[in-house]
Structures are given as C-alpha cells and as structure tokens.
Amino acid sequence: MLVCYGEILMRLSPPDRLRFAQAGQFDVRYGGAEANVACAYVQMGGQAKMVTVLPESGLGDAAVASVAGFGVDCSAISRKGDRIGIYFLEKGASYRPSKVIYDRKNSAIAKVTRADFDWDAILDGADDFFFTGITPAVSDPVVLLDALQVCRKRGIRVWCDVNYRATLWSTTKAGAVMTPMLSYVDVLVVNEEHARDLFGVTPGYGITKPEDRLASLGEQLKKLFGCREVVLTARESISSDDNEIWALLYADGKVSKSSQYKLHIVDRVGGGDALSAALIYTESGCIENRLVDTSDRQRQIDFACAANALKHSVEGDVLIAMAEEVCAVMESVKDGGRVRVVR
C-alpha cells in the first residue's frame, strides 16, 4: 500500500489554450502532486491511500470523488476548513510559456494540525509513503514530520519529490525546512536547479556533460541526506509545445540514464508525478507480472521516464495509463519511436 500526503486542488483552465484575458469560462479538473501519484499508481496495478484535508462542501465532495474515481482509498481524508485550494492554468503555446496562478491561501490544508491525523492508524499496513516539497510549503511541516517519524519506526519506504515552487516560498526557507525531512527519505527526486538553489549542491568543477553533472549531483545528495537512491530529472524546452526529457538514477554507486524523449505536449502538468508513481511501482510488491525487474536499475529508470513522457500526451493532471501501456512506450522509443495502432 502506498500512502500519499498533500493538497488536492481545483484546477481552472481557459479552454483551447486561450489566455486569461480572453477566457469567458474555465475547464474544471482536480489534482495535486501527491494525488496525481496516488491515482497513477493505482492504474498501474497498486493500492494507494490519499491523506489530505478538504472542506465539507460540494467542491470538497467533488475533489474526493475525482480521486476516489481512480480507485484510491480516501478514508483518511479529513473534512474541515472553509475552502479548497485553487490554481489557474494558462496553457502556453509556441514561444508563449504556460502560466500558473495559485489561490490557496487559507485553504483547508493550510490549517491542518497534528490532531487531524492518527499516523499510526493511517500507516498501518503501508509499504511506501510519498510527499513533495509542496506539502510543507502550504501546511504545518510538523504534521509531515510526525508521519515521517512513524514511517521510520515502521520501516516504511519514504519517497520525496522536492518539487520546489517559487511562488509558495523562498529557496532559503524551503532548504531550511526540507533538509531535516530528507534524512527520513529513501528515494529522492530532484533536478539540478533545485539541488543547487535549496541545498547548495553543484556538480564537480569542470564537469560539463549533462549525464556526468547529474551523476555528480546524485552522489553528493546521497551522501548529504543518506538517501538510498537519487533520481535526477532533466528537461530541455524547445518551445511550450516541444520538449525533450530524460532522467538519471543514482543507486549503489552506479548511474543509469533513461532514454531521451522528444515530446509534442498536450499537457505537461503531472509529468514528474507520473515518473514518481512509476518509480514506486517498480519497487513495489504489486508487479506480479514482472513487467519491471526490481534488480534492473536501467529498466526501472526507463519505465519511469516513459511514464513521464506518456503523461505529456494526456489532458489533465493525472496519467491515465496501465503499466502495459507505459512498457509499450518504453519499448517503442528503443525501436526508433515508432507508434503502432492498437487493434
């Protein structure tokens, strides 16, 4: 069982890539980094539980229904507070970048207290726990620390995506708050920019090749926080519509680099969440069909990056795909990227 803790938000987007100034209506979806991971993980074949706080209202009900609709256990969601967090997304196009405006001040999770969750009960039977750096940015970090301490006591694997958001807090505060938390983390997901800005970790002098730079960062981060594995993600933006992505896994003193994906983007929100869900899937006990051998680090990072790539083709925050579909993408890129119709 995977347990995810974080905020579920309402997403409002102008249709057809209109700008905010042109919008006469908004498309409504629900998501959030941790919820996206839980939903994607369940579709791959795992079991997940979502922990958050939502208001007792029609909008809160809609958010719960959205996540529960994917098969995620929502029994640990606390219902209190006055409002749901919102974010407005203006999708970019060509040379116009996407824009995000958050409206999450005083949302339900911002008022969470230690009394809201019985972590011993919530984490009973859990194998994995996932959070991102967004959660301590928008809520009391002590509540998250309580969960991490129970995970340590119970031997539950902890996964963290740093997922820094400059509109939520400064790099100085983020680094100070997250540093003690990362000592509880088994697998850390981060990119080069955030490793530098939050934790002061940079590649060794004179290292220029992208994979060598990421390998240097992985080694240093593992030593700094004691993580078992470090995953570093990379992206090259050609335009708002076209990106190239890859990832690197540092574990057991060895580096595994994923295939590179050239993407034409439908919706890039949630790509990193899909990667995290796929990584957890590769190390979980739910892979009865052995789609990914847990001892094969190269195949693990290839599977995770394939999930990231596939999410960019799916509208909304959540990757909607089974593990077999992710595997098909993983194999297709090794076959020159040829995509065949499934009949």
Where would I find each of the regions flagged by the language model?
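Glycine-rich phosphate/adenosyl-contacting loop at the front of the ribokinase-like
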Residues: 1-73, 113-115, 257, 264-266, ...
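Short beta-strand scaffold segments in enzyme catalytic cores
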Residues: 39, 86-90, 247-249
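A short, structured active-site edge motif that brings together acidic residues
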Residues: 76-85
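Short, glycine/acidic-enriched loop or turn micro-motifs at the edges of active sites
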Residues: 10, 164, 194, 270, ...
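Ribokinase/PfkB-type carbohydrate-kinase core domain
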Residues: 1-3, 68-69, 74, 92-255, ...
